[in-house]
Amino acid sequence: MGRFIFVSFGLLVVFLSLSGTGADCPPDWSSYEGNCYLVVKEKKTWAEAQKFCTEQRKECHLVSFHSAEEVDFVVSKTFPILSYDLVWIGLNNIWNDCMLEWSDGTKLTYKAWSGIPECIISKTSDNQWLSRACSRTQPFVCKFQA
């Protein structure tokens, strides 16, 4: 009986230490692969959303995606909270200086952007990225490295 209690206590200690791996994230944030994510339902412009994120923590920004698995994780968090599937992400063309090149390989030296800064939203239901005027309001996702 004493051995059973000792083993049970040891397993409890291991479980509690492992369950604390996401504890680096503040309350209401979700943890994935060493990053913390916050889904914000309130609609803001891209700049307001980015400002909101940086006000949470200095190193926090609108979400950036680096794998399909990360997108799937964010979708699993946004779907239950939002009534629709469009959220601001960290991509933008505010400075109109995309690193584009012509199909013949020459650099983009002449620019004729429309003058309306474009920011990127993610359609989380099918992982499409769409360009929208930065002045439109959308929900968004913040991210920082834990």
From Swiss-Prot:
Signal sequence extent: 1-23
GO MF, any single term: toxin activity
Any single Pfam family the record assigns to this protein: Lectin_C
Family affiliation: Belongs to the snaclec family.
Disulfide bond entries: 25-36, 53-142, 119-134
Assembly information from the UniProt record: Heterodimer of subunits alpha and beta; disulfide-linked.
Keywords of the record: Disulfide bond, Hemostasis impairing toxin, Platelet aggregation inhibiting toxin, Secreted, Signal, Toxin
Keyword Signal: yes
GO cellular component term, pick one: extracellular region
Biological function: Is a potent glycoprotein Ibalpha (GP1BA) antagonist. Concentration-dependently inhibits botrocetin-, ristocetin- and low dose thrombin-induced platelet aggregation. Inhibits platelet adhesion only through inhibiting the vWF interaction with GP1BA, but has minimal effect on other platelet receptors, such as alpha-IIb/beta-3 (ITGA2B/ITGB3) or alpha-2/beta-1 (ITGA2/ITGB1). Causes an instant severe thrombocytopenia in rats and is not lethal to mice.
UniProt-listed SUPFAM superfamilies: C-type lectin-like
Tissue: Expressed by the venom gland.
Miscellaneous remark of the record: Negative results: lacks hemorrhagic activity in rabbits. Has no inhibitory effect on the coagulation cascade of humans. Does not agglutinate human erythrocytes of four groups (AC, BC, OC, ABK) and rabbit erythrocytes as well, which indicates it is not really a lectin.
Organism: Deinagkistrodon acutus
PANTHER family in alphabetical order: MANNOSE, PHOSPHOLIPASE, LECTIN RECEPTOR RELATED
Alphabetized InterPro entries for the sequence: C-type_lectin-like, C-type_lectin-like/link_sf, C-type_lectin/snaclec_domain, C-type_lectin_CS, CTDL_fold
Compartments reported by the entry: Secreted
Domain named C-type lectin: residues: 32-143
SMART domains: CLECT
Descriptive protein name: Snaclec agkicetin-C subunit beta
Top-level taxon of the source organism: Eukaryota
Coiled-coil stretches noted in the UniProt entry, renumbered to this chain: none
